[in-house]
């Protein structure tokens, strides 16, 4: 539980944008310790991000003070009759036109249509009362099918909701911790949301905490490079440099300072560059390290000793097939059909490779 809350706090502090309109709700969220309150304040923070994002895109002012429509008009110096208590998510008063914004998130078409009709009717019920005061109502209902917003990356949004859902495990009230509708909406969003980002796209969003030497290396690599050169220009430049070098070498302007070397000698010299290191690594040890350091490679290439089967089935192929089936059974790649096909291709490729190697051994 503490680890889940710590992960939520880390996401809130590091990956949700610093906006003054979110500061109050972020403080309320970060100040909670009980799972029930962390869950409620986390959902409020997520809803606040969506409301502000919708207000910004609609050109409205976010109603962070939870003002009613009547209070908004009174603060603007407009006398109006008594109005039903309606607290919009956003508003904007332009001359005699009042823009009211309502936003919501629903994952299923049925609940989306129901909520859209409810919000539309709620705003329409005060249209005639506002007309008496000379105010023209402009209602805006912003309905969304997901929780994406501009204040956090998509993978942070998904992870944040997933961690909030995990907090239900530590509560005895389960979905009664908050409204039942909120519980089902959270379940639907986690069930229907498919992360659109691949692993590399998500890695690119992470903060770059590398040292300055990386920038210096990239600057040295790109310094003096002309990006406007075509492939023919590059080939022509290389050929001209090589022709000049060849001509000067044949004419005697350049001394022949070449010597024959062996690959083994080069590797030995390279391994002895750092005198402080006492490790004597050879090629055999270096080739074994990648296999031994990877549990997956150890599982595939392991040599088992025990009772041998009478069949000619290749054990290495069977281990590979078993491993791929286990990966597919996890249902992690259900939305990546091409990657699933790649896993299927690995099985016949491995079998063909083993058959060829076995045939060569028999010959």
UniProtKB/Swiss-Prot annotation:
Its assembly, as annotated, is: Homomultimer; the oligomeric structure is essential for the polymerase activity. Interacts with nucleoprotein N. Interacts with protein Z; this interaction inhibits viral transcription and replication, Z partially blocks the product exit tunnel for the releasing nascent RNA product.
A further note on this protein reads: Classified as His(-) endonuclease since it does not have a histidine upstream of the active site that coordinates the first cation. His(-) endonucleases display very low activity in vitro, although they are clearly active in vivo.
Q: Name one GO cellular component term.
A: virion component
Q: Which family does it belong to?
A: Belongs to the Arenaviridae RNA polymerase family.
Q: Which organism is it from?
A: Lymphocytic choriomeningitis virus (strain WE)
Q: Which reaction does it catalyse?
A: RNA(n) + a ribonucleoside 5'-triphosphate = RNA(n+1) + diphosphate
Cofactor: bound how, per the entry note?
Answer: For endonuclease activity. Binds 2 Mn(2+) ions in the active site. The divalent metal ions are crucial for catalytic activity.
- Its job: RNA-dependent RNA polymerase, which is responsible for the replication and transcription of the viral RNA genome using antigenomic RNA as an intermediate. During transcription, synthesizes subgenomic RNAs and assures their capping by a cap-snatching mechanism, which involves the endonuclease activity cleaving the host capped pre-mRNAs. These short capped RNAs are then used as primers for viral transcription. The 3'-end of subgenomic mRNAs molecules are heterogeneous and not polyadenylated.
* Keyword set, alphabetical order: Host cytoplasm, Hydrolase, Magnesium, Manganese, Metal-binding, Nucleotide-binding, Nucleotidyltransferase, RNA-directed RNA polymerase, Transferase, Viral RNA replication, Virion
Family annotation (Pfam families): Arena_RNA_pol, ArenaCapSnatch
Q: What is known of its domains?
A: The N-terminus contains the endonuclease activity (endoN). The central region contains the RdRp activity.
Q: Which domain of life is it from?
A: Viruses
Could you say which residues bind Mn(2+) 2 here? 89
Q: What is this protein called?
A: RNA-directed RNA polymerase L
Which InterPro entries does its entry note?
Answer: CapSnatch_arenavir, CapSnatch_bunyavir, RNA_pol_arenavir
């Amino acid at each position: 539980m503490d680890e889940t809350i710590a992960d939520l706090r880390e996401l809130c502090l590091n990956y949700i944008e610093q906006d003054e309109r979110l500061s109050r709700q972020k403080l309320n969220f970060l100040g909670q310790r009980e799972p029930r309150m962390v869950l409620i304040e986390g959902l409020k923070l997520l809803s606040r991000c969506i409301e502000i994002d919708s207000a910004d895109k609609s050109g409205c002012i976010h109603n962070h003070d939870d003002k009613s429509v009547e209070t908004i008009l009174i603060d603007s110096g407009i006398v109006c009759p008594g109005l039903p208590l309606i607290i919009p998510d956003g508003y904007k008063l332009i001359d005699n036109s009042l823009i009211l914004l309502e936003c919501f998130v629903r994952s299923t078409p049925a609940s989306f249509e129901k909520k859209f009709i409810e919000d539309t009717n709620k705003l329409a019920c005060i249209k005639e009362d506002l007309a008496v005061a000379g105010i023209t109502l402009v209602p805006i209902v912003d309905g969304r099918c997901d929780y994406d917003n501009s204040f956090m990356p998509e993978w942070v949004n998904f992870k944040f909701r997933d961690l909030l859902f995990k907090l239900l495990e530590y509560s005895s009230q389960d979905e009664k911790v908050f409204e039942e509708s909120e519980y089902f909406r959270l379940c639907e969003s986690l069930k229907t949301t498919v992360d659109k980002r691949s692993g590399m796209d998500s890695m690119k969003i992470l903060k770059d905490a590398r040292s300055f030497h990386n920038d210096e290396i990239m600057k040295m690599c790109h310094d003096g490079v002309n990006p406007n050169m075509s492939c023919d220009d590059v080939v022509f430049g290389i050929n001209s440099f090589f022709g000049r070098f060849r001509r000067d070498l044949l004419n005697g302007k350049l001394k022949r300072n070449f010597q024959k070397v062996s690959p083994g000698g080069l590797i030995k010299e390279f391994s002895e560059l750092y005198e402080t290191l006492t490790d004597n690594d050879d090629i055999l040890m270096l080739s074994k390290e990648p296999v031994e350091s990877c549990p997956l490679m150890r599982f595939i290439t392991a040599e088992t000793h025990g009772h041998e089967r009478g069949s000619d089935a290749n054990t290495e192929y069977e281990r590979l097939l078993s491993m791929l089936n286990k990966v597919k059974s996890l249902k992690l790649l259900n939305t990546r059909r091409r990657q699933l096909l790649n896993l299927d291709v690995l099985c016949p490729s491995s079998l063909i490779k083993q058959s060829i190697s076995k045939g060569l051994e028999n010959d």
